[in-house]
Amino acid sequence: MSKEKFERTKPHVNVGTIGHVDHGKTTLTAAITKVMAEVRGGEFKDYADIDNAPEERERGITISTAHVEYESEIRHYAHVDCPGHADYIKNMITGAAQMDGAIIVIAATDGPMAQTREHILLSKQVGVPYIVVYMNKADMVDDEELVELVEMEIRELLDEYDFPGDDTPVIFGSALKALEGDISDIGVPSILKLVDALDSYIPTPKRDTDKSFIMPIEDVFSISGRGTVVTGRIEAGVVNIGDELEIVGIKDTKTTTCTGVEMFRKLLSSGEAGDNVGVLLRGTKREEVERGQVLSKPGSIKPHAKFEAEIYILSKDEGGRHTPFFNNYRPQFYFRTTDVTGACQLPDGIEMVMPGDNVKMRVELLSPIAMEDGLRFAIREGGRTVGAGVVSKVTD
């Protein structure tokens, strides 16, 4: 039995392990659950549990992900670990597992490798804000100078992708020794040090209700004598009766006022993140609003049509395309609640994109959508999902 009841009072932070294949991500994940279960209660997950991660489907894409949880003195952590390299890429691009911070695992015996670099770049592109380093397999290196070299190399690599290399915590240890209960510095204490680094280096994320109000519009009705009602699920923030709001995307931005909030046929004085509501708008005609626009706090989000994106294209086995696509491919981009056609520009030197590939590209939409960096979307052809992506940079 676990020693203490799970408390919902601690702030919740999402993290995950990233890094090159066989550098010890899954062993480290198991070691953290074991050490923290002994210190704080909770459940120990062994290597096999994590490695046999069930397949999940996110936007039609098959991803194997293991979810574990543990508590530190001040926080509750939800931690994701993926068995395969492709799973990481899919996970990060679809946002199936949003990370407030990542633990990059690097074998001291190898130093940073190709996938280490790719995961750091992807973290930057998809907006993982903080990275902590665990230098693993410390039990297999005797050469102090080699360790310092690897540490220097990883800090430089982080700098290269605009992470603060000099300030990043680097913890030196052996996940395997920690899992075996070894109490020398590189064993259990290295895990405690790592969790301390997560606590102190990754800030507590802003709660959704503290962010600016935004609600993607799913449907529009007019109620005679009362005006226009838009319905949807509030993505972030809070809306109160009397608030001035903007309707953003597709058409020119319009200003309106909230005169009522309804949920399950009951009138509320306000609605907050996560609520499915109807918002009554004053002075707005039904034909001025459509699905795919968003209702937002004035000035908080702007419409854009051009952006750079990091994209994953489904493989044939995932129900995606059977053939590659080329420059100027024009699928539909599904943002929040609607499809908008856009043209794709491939990077120099890339002639085509095969099913199962991930690629960075520039996109220009036919009509603008309320958008900011980090927004996720699906790529569709005639209602069938053929890819997923994330806006890495708005360019207009």
Curated annotation (Swiss-Prot):
Chain ranges of the tr-type G domain: 10-206
Q: What is a single cellular component term in the Gene Ontology annotation? A: cytoplasm
The family note in this entry says: Belongs to the TRAFAC class translation factor GTPase superfamily. Classic translation factor GTPase family. EF-Tu/EF-1A subfamily.
CDD domains, alphabetically?
A: EF_Tu, EFTU_II, EFTU_III
Name the positions where GTP binds. Answer: 19-26, 81-85, 136-139
Where does it localize? Answer: Cytoplasm
Where does the record place the region G4?
Answer: 136-139
Chain positions covered by the region annotation G5: 174-176
Question: What are the boundaries of the region G3?
Answer: 81-84
Q: Give the residues the record marks as binding Mg(2+).
A: 26
> Which region ranges are annotated with the description G2?
60-64
Record's keyword terms, sorted = Cytoplasm, Elongation factor, GTP-binding, Hydrolase, Magnesium, Metal-binding, Nucleotide-binding, Protein biosynthesis
- Report the EC number(s), separated by commas if there are several: 3.6.5.3
Subunit note? Monomer.
Q: What is this protein called?
A: Elongation factor Tu
Instruction: From the UniProt record, list the reaction(s) this protein catalyses.
Output: GTP + H2O = GDP + phosphate + H(+)
Q: Which domain of life is it from?
A: Bacteria
Keyword Metal-binding in annotation: yes
The Gene Ontology terms for molecular function here are:
GTP binding; GTPase activity; guanosine tetraphosphate binding; translation elongation factor activity
InterPro entries (UniProt xref): EF-Tu_GTP-bd, EF-Tu_GTPase, EFTu-like_2, EFTU_2, G_TR_CS, P-loop_NTPase, Small_GTP-bd, T_Tr_GTP-bd_dom
Q: Where is this region: G1?
A: 19-26
- Recorded name of the encoding gene: tuf1
